[in-house]
Design a protein with these regions (language model features):
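Adenosine-phosphate binding glycine-rich loop
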Residues: 1-19, 212, 325-438
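Structured beta-strand/loop patches that form or line metal/cofactor-binding pockets in enzymes
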Residues: 35-63
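Glycine/serine-rich phosphate-binding loop and adjoining beta1-alpha1 elements at the start
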Residues: 88, 107-220
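General beta-strand structural signal in soluble alpha/beta enzymes
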Residues: 98, 152-156, 180-184, 227, ...
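Glycine-rich phosphate/diphosphate-binding loop of Rossmann-like nucleotide-binding domains
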Residues: 188, 193-303
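Rossmann-like adenosine-cofactor binding region
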Residues: 256-355, 360
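Conserved small/polar residues in nucleotide/adenosyl-binding loops
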Residues: 307, 440-442
């Protein structure tokens, strides 16, 4: 770790992700000499390529603005780089390296031929007109296009990048290259997208949690759930949980948290979708419309059976974990990327709370992106039912892999299981493909 820290000084998010993985992987490597011989861990924590570029664009007043763009192409041992683009003021190299590193393991768990990467910009779409967002997206992809391709690197959406932004970037890519290909996923259904893609991460989160609960002799039926966030992952985690008989009582955004003790039903969820996806409003407007409680902060002090953190990294700390456990929470399934701090994770595990780590529980989105890539290659569209079944099968297989590598007596360490299962496939591929040992000059 000292070498990693010296090479990545000040990159706290990335170092946190590497440390959490290393704590699980190092003992496994010590028991498997081939990974030591090939120095796999040191190779794995170094991105294959990091691209940083400026993104100039013109605002509606005619002024030239400049943002910074990134693409971290982390590992391509098992397939083309795959991972989202995030547009948010908090974006920096550390965050994207952490996300790209996590993506390597997550993509490996899906069993699809997908490498890992991540990208984005410190551009903030909030408060920008549609024309400004379009001009930024076009400028961003005008540089990025030379580094991506259907068999090289296939970006998707993330925070701040939805179907609108993917459309603007895909259109510009097509103009530049004169090519219609599956270079981006999250596309509109009429121009190469896949059904279930918007729902996939949320649905996948619930499918994984359902498998975890079933193994422990529990179900979603009748359970009270608290959810943080109010974007796609939160919305569709809620939708699938309601379908399985659970009662969801909270949503949140950066302004605060709503608590609806009567439960968020299908009608209320449709209101949230319109509020957040179309009107781009604040969640406190829900509290006004449905006369329920709104407060600043997060929902982790609320009494619940299951917690689904679906907002952002490190949103749930040790004190939050203690509150959840004392309030009777039996399971936590991560929808966001690294939403729980290390202390919180340790507390859940020591308290025998079922804890699903993001590498496994959040893999539904990239799995369905992989299915979109397959449909693009085949020049065909699968039905909603076909995609949903394939997604569910993938999540059940991920759960089985986590159980295989994480079983400890009668219990399952899902952190250990997810990390080792994801590691083995990538590490073995890296060994099989060799390294350049010498250069021959003619």
């Amino acid at each position: 770790m000292k070498l990693v820290e010296s090479r990545n000084s000040g990159e706290k998010e990335f170092l946190q992700a590497v440390l959490e993985v290393s704590e699980v992987i190092i003992p496994f490597i010590q028991d498997n000499k081939k990974y030591q011989t090939h120095n796999i861990l040191e190779r794995l924590v170094e991105p294959e390529r990091t691209i940083i570029f400026r993104v100039p664009w013109q605002d509606d007043s005619g002024n030239i603005q400049v943002n910074r763009g990134y693409r971290v192409e982390f590992n391509s041992a098992i397939g083309p780089y795959k991972g989202g683009l995030r547009f948010h003021p908090s974006v920096n190299l550390s965050i994207l390296k952490f996300l790209g590193f996590e993506q390597v393991f997550k993509n490996s768990l899906t069993s699809l031929p997908l490498g890992g990467g991540k990208g984005g910009s410190d551009f903030d779409p909030k408060g920008k007109s549609e024309s400004e967002v379009m001009r930024f997206c076009q400028s961003f992809i005008t540089e990025l296009y030379r580094h991506i391709g259907a068999n090289t690197d296939v970006p998707a959406g993330d925070i701040g990048v939805g179907a609108r932004e993917i459309g603007f970037m895909f259109g510009q890519y097509k103009r530049i290259t004169n090519e219609f290909s599956g270079v981006l996923t999250g596309k509109g259904i009429n121009w190469g997208g896949s059904l279930i893609r918007p729902e996939a991460t949320g649905y996948g989160n619930i499918y994984f949690a359902q498998s975890m609960l079933n193994l422990a002799g529990e179900t979603f039926d009748g359970k009270t759930i608290v959810i943080s966030g109010s974007g796609n992952v939160a919305q569709y985690s809620c939708e699938k949980a309601i379908e399985l008989g659970a009662k969801v009582v909270s949503f949140s955004d950066s302004s605060g948290c709503i608590y609806d003790p009567d439960g968020i039903n299908e009608e209320k969820l449709e209101y949230i979708k319109e509020l957040k996806n179309i009107k781009r409003g604040r969640i406190k407007e829900y509290a006004k419309k449905f006369s329920c409680k709104f407060s600043e902060g997060n929902p982790w002090q609320l009494k619940c059976d299951i917690a689904l953190p679906c907002a952002t990294q490190n949103e749930l700390n040790l004190n939050d974990a203690k509150a959840l456990v004392s309030n009777g929470c039996i399971a936590v399934s991560e929808g966001a990327n690294m939403p729980c701090t290390s202390d919180a994770i340790n507390h859940f595990q020591s308290s025998n709370v079922l804890y699903a780590q993001v590498k496994a529980s959040n893999a539904g989105g990239v799995a369905t992106s992989g299915l979109e890539m397959s449909q693009n290659s085949l020049r065909m569209n699968w039905t909603r039912e076909e995609v949903d079944k394939r997604l569910k099968d993938i999540m059940l297989n991920i759960h089985s892999s986590c159980v295989e590598f994480g079983r400890a007596g009668k219990s399952v360490d899902y952190v250990k299981g997810a990390n080792i299962a994801g590691f083995v496939k990538v590490a073995d591929a890296m060994i099989d493909q060799g390294i350049v040992l010498s250069l021959i000059h003619i």
